[in-house]
């Protein structure tokens, strides 16, 4: 799953929480979302150890899938994929496939593969392709990066008028779609990002479970090797290709 971030604004999520702290943090998510995120991370560790006590908080986890905090929804989508036996998680994840944030949608799509649900296939395939950042407003564009630079979620890519434009996902800048200083309309493309190697790898792992015959061209492209991608991505693509073909027979 796309959960490499154990730090958030200087908070270390490795500190072990008591059951009462987990309850407190989840119940106070509106005021202190990063503490709630800490609790979700701890719950994931409980699930991985087969600790059924964690089930007492499952209804709250479903509730948090509608929290306004992007980071919290992203973590929530990751966590709900850790227990495919709880049907309300399945239902909440399907709703997150239309979330406004790409990172939330991607984690939801990956988590759904643990339920054997292919509903997020479109999102998984999108993770194998470049991503375009568009402007939500009209105005004069001023870029803050160059072609070839790498961005992470939240990186400032530029401004349109006074509006900050930040990248919602990681990737390398493949192209700047407008001339610096140009006037742009709301909805126009600004930056094209490459597929991220970790996102591509996770998408291929997800497609191994739910990929279909019509996905073979995208997977085969990675199996042949894509410039800038590590060999483990190519190897994963080969495994995914083999599994999809075996299902299609």
Predicted regions and their residues:
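Short inter-helical turns and helix N-cap capping residues of alpha-solenoid HEAT/ARM repeat scaffolds
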Residues: 30-32, 68-69, 100-101, 132, ...
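Conserved hydrophobic register position within alpha-solenoid helical repeats
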Residues: 36-39, 76, 108, 203, ...
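Short beta-strand-turn/beta-hairpin segments enriched in glycine/proline and small hydrophobics
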Residues: 117, 128-141, 155-175, 192-193
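Acidic, glycine-anchored pre-beta loop/turn
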Residues: 143-152, 176-188
């Amino acid at each position: 799953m796309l959960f490499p971030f154990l730090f958030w604004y200087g908070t270390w999520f490795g500190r072990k929480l008591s059951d009462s702290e987990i309850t407190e943090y989840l119940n106070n998510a509106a005021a202190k979302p990063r503490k709630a995120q800490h609790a979700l991370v701890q719950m994931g560790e409980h699930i991985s150890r087969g600790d059924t006590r964690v089930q007492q908080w499952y209804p709250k986890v479903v509730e948090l899938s509608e929290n306004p905090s992007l980071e919290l929804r992203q973590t929530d989508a990751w966590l709900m994929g850790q227990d495919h036996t709880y049907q309300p998680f399945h239902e909440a994840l399907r709703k997150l496939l239309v979330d406004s944030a790409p990172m939330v949608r991607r984690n939801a799509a990956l988590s759904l593969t643990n339920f054997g649900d292919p509903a997020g296939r479109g999102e998984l395939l999108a993770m194998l392709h470049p991503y375009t950042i568009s402007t939500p407003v009209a105005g004069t564009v001023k870029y803050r990066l160059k072609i070839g630079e790498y961005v992470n979620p939240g990186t400032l890519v530029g401004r349109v008028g006074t509006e900050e434009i930040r990248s919602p996902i990681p990737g390398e800048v493949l192209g700047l779609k407008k001339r610096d200083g140009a006037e742009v309309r709301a909805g126009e493309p600004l930056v094209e990002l490459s597929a991220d190697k970790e996102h591509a790898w996770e998408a291929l792992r997800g497609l191994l479970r739910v990929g279909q015959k019509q996905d073979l061209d995208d997977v085969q492209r990675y199996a042949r090797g894509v410039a800038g991608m590590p060999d483990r991505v190519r190897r994963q693509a080969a495994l995914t290709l083999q599994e999809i073909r075996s299902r299609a027979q």
